[in-house]
Every structure is written in C-alpha cells, then in structure tokens.
UniProtKB/Swiss-Prot annotation:
Keywords, ordered alphabetically: Chloroplast, Plastid, Ribonucleoprotein, Ribosomal protein, RNA-binding, rRNA-binding
PANTHER family (alphabetical): RIBOSOMAL PROTEIN S19P FAMILY MEMBER, SMALL RIBOSOMAL SUBUNIT PROTEIN US19M
GO CC annotations on file: chloroplast; mitochondrial small ribosomal subunit
Family in the record: Belongs to the universal ribosomal protein uS19 family.
GO MF term set: rRNA binding; structural constituent of ribosome
Function: Protein S19 forms a complex with S13 that binds strongly to the 16S ribosomal RNA.
GO terms for biological process, alphabetical: ribosomal small subunit assembly; translation
InterPro entries per record: Ribosomal_uS19, Ribosomal_uS19_bac-type, Ribosomal_uS19_SF
Subcellular location as annotated: Plastid, Chloroplast
Main localization, broad class: plastid
Name recorded for this polypeptide: Small ribosomal subunit protein uS19c
Disulfide cross-links: none
Length: 98
C-alpha cells in the first residue's frame, strides 16, 4: 500500500541533518545508516550512503532515478544459492541391508 500524498516521505531526521551538513560544506562523503525504511529524497542525489544489510554496510551512490524509493531496496539482505550441492554425502543405513 502506498503512502498517502498528504504525508511527507519518511526520512530519519539524523540522516537529513548529515546530508544538509555535507551540502552546506559542498563535500561528498560516505554516510553510514541503519535506516533501510527511509525514502530517497532529492537532496540525497550525488551522495554515497552506506546502508546496513545485516552484517556490513553496502555503499550506494544515489542517482536521480532512485528518488521515491526506499534505501533498503538497493541493499539485499538474503542471497539464495542455486539448488543443491553436486555431490551429496551418502548415508550408511544398515536397516536397508537386513
């Protein structure tokens, strides 16, 4: 379900403050955050934000096409392995030999 247009997009306040400080200084740096639920707003464009994905921070460079999306969409937390291993260990089941 989409967020109501009456409300502003959700962004954690400390993240907005850090971005505003860097914009005033006209510097680009990596900003670490644990807030995967924050929405990408236009003031974030051009910055690199390291989003926590459960074990480590994944640096993401923000472009204009990402506005309106959540930070967590660009940092996957699960990696699926394909199928089963090629060689399965054999079972030594003595009951079948009786």
């Amino acid at each position: 379900m989409a967020r109501s247009l009456k409300k502003n997009p959700f962004v954690v306040h400390h993240l907005v403050r850090k971005i505003d400080k860097l914009n005033k200084k006209k510097k680009k740096g990596i900003i670490k955050t644990w807030s995967r639920a924050s929405t990408i707003i236009p003031t974030m464009i051009g910055h690199t934000i390291a989003v926590y994905k459960g074990k480590e921070h994944l640096p993401i460079y923000i472009t204009d096409y990402m506005t309106g999306h959540k930070l967590g969409e660009f940092a996957p937390t699960l990696y699926f392995l394909r199928g089963h291993p090629t060689e399965r260990p054999t079972k030594n089941d003595n009951r079948s030999q009786r």
